[in-house]
Amino acid sequence: MHRLAAVPGSSSPGDGVLFIEQPAATAVLLTSADTDLTALAGQLDRDPSPLGPGRSLGGLNLAALQHPAVLDHYIRTSLAQSELVIVRLLGGRGHFSYGLEQLKGWAEARPERQLMVLSGTAEE
């Protein structure tokens, strides 16, 4: 669920960009909170298929997707077959505005895709 992989040849030496690839998942939780991912991992340890047979659930910390090129690559590869992306933001939309814009486009590209954005703070 939390595996990070560099794509060979995908970044210039020294630019600090690490492209993220994860196995395809039916639903993906993108969150600012490591505790969300810990809870998700615990649930998956208890029930590896909580969405039913042939359906999977994955997660990633939003901090891994801060660079626009990394986010674009992640959407094109890891989210290509996903049906639901849940984004839990801590600190407001401004911290992930490009990401929200791109994920909105991802959701609008196919009718079976859904995007859910949850605020992790009271003011949002």
Residue ranges of each PLM-predicted region?
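An N-terminal assembly and electron-transfer interface module characteristic of large anaerobic redox
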Residues: 1-124
